[in-house]
């Protein structure tokens, strides 16, 4: 049976067709780089929204295999940190990291290194990724390692991106609380659940934590990098993760470069770390992942 698009998503689609919000709409909640990225993302996806009907958006091919559980991949039974290894060619904060790298080859390195899950950047303008990267990675692992889960790492603003993530083989999507209204979060989270995808709620402060919990988030990541100014501070995880309910899977994101960093956030209660730049640059991802789990 095909999952149906939630009614609020239909309403949001119609609103989005009529008026793509400009950066100024969200300036009160964001500033600088994040505002720029979100404004661009809304413009970027507008043609994709106009090109599909509500029925197209609601239809997720029932023949697609059910994706493996992202949440389950982050719950290790040995007390060690789960590691979400990210494929990221560049970023606004670091600049070029490994521009020419093959997403599938890097994914194979991560799998061999013992990564618990993968995060694949699909934003092209700012991070050098694409949906084709995600498709290639999930296709490569569908038979070789079907339990390996992938997060579609992008700036999600509309259900069409969730339909794309499902079609491309993702197991989870990212919801950046700071960048979205509560109505938008509700639409995205509802549609992700209908599509069988987990949602990683990303927060940066107590107010965003409360909003994520209000929406029923089961996986919450503390981004140690302030996306408005791109400054990193691991003390954010140390301050916020102890405030998570016990049932919530806690992820610490960004600014984790070695075992000492990983130990800090694990001591605060993190179940998993999401690491991109350090693993992309590591001569041996296996050695670095082992260091994270010491």
Language model feature labels by segment:
Residues 83-85, 118-120, 150-153, 173-175, ...:
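Hydrophobic faces of well-ordered beta-strands that scaffold small-molecule active sites
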Residues 157-168, 206-215, 256-275:
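Catalytic cores of alpha/beta
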Residues 128-151, 186-201, 234-250, 292-294:
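Alpha-helix-loop-beta-strand connector modules within alpha/beta enzyme cores
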Residues 29-100:
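An N-cap/entry alpha-helix motif that binds or orients negatively charged groups
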Residues 99-118, 144, 162-172, 188-198, ...:
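Alpha/beta enzyme core
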Residues 164-183, 222-229, 270-288:
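Glycine-rich phosphate-binding active-site loops on the catalytic face of alpha/beta enzymes
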Residues 1-27:
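Short, low-complexity, charge-dense intrinsically disordered segments
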Residues 87-102, 148-157, 200-202, 252:
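Active-site mouth loops of central-metabolism enzymes
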